[in-house]
Amino acid sequence: NVAANLATCFGLNTAIASAMADYPIGRRIEAAVRKAGVTAYYQRFPFDGVRGPNMAIVWSDRGQGVRGPTVFYNRSNEAAGRLKPGSFDWKAIFAKKVRWFHSGGIFSALSPTTPALVIEAMEAAKKAGAVVSFDLNYRAKLWAVAAAEQGLSSAQAEEGAAKTLRNIVSHVDVLVGNEEDLQKGLGLKGPEAESKGKLDPTAFFGMIGQVTKDFPNIKAVATTLREVHSTNRHSWSAVLWLDGKNYTAPTCELDVYDRVGGGDGFAAGLFYGLLSGKSPEESLKLGWAHGALLTTTPGDTSMASLDQVEAFAKGGSARIQR
């Protein structure tokens, strides 16, 4: 999602390294990646005609009114779970002047081999001089299923997830994650001061000291803030800690069409701003604006233009453009 957003909305050259199963669903996904303008480096796997390996299939009910959105998926025998260190020639990939490498907690939870692959890629990125970012995206279901396959309990799953993610985050420059991600994903304690509400940044900023104490390599931490009034009505903001300073985006009221992908939209806008040499405030607002606009259209990737994002970041409105 982040790579597609940066390509389609922000006009950057992007690429992904992933798995591809050679069967019709895989070819459909491959075509969509090409259409988004994203270069792909695939480790290909033959499909056996019956059981896979498969491409993950995700269903989303965007909800309406009092019916909340629901996301469920089938990741059985997923091709990406077969990826491991050595699956990609990182030296060749990063030789193409890559400036930023991004990964996340969902991919890291797919199998026992994917975390080591993430770290291998991060180490190669560092050697090439690229910025390394990571979205914690803590998903209890994914970690629980992976642990259950090894005969572990849910408590052991959470402990194992924190151990794995802490190892990965020790290689990261820019971290994306909210208070729950930081607590469950990294095993950090919550702040003593209670948050006044979903949009109050106190809880988030209150945890930064723990983050930087445990991970002195971290230069920036960011997340969105969202208060849900109904499925289609949200209050929306975002926060950024960068080089010791706190930044908070404005709060706006969103009429939401499809909330899935808003977080990736925020990350893409933030990364674009930082890559483009924008100020921390401008970068945060670009992420905030792009994430907001993404929730107004179906799907989890952007249909917005850079002009629209910049206008909204500067205080644009929903007045008709003629």
State where each predicted segment sits.
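A short helix->loop->beta-strand "cap" motif at the edges of active sites that frequently abuts
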Residues: 11, 127-131, 215-219
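Alpha-helix C-terminal capping segments
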Residues: 1-13, 35, 273-276
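Conserved N-terminal subdomain of the carbohydrate kinase-like
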Residues: 13-105, 148-149, 310-322
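Hydrophobic faces of well-ordered beta-strands that scaffold small-molecule active sites
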Residues: 16, 132-134, 175
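Conserved phosphate/ATP/ADP-binding segment of small-molecule kinases
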Residues: 140-244
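Anion (oxyanion) recognition and catalysis
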Residues: 7-8, 34, 119, 123-127, ...
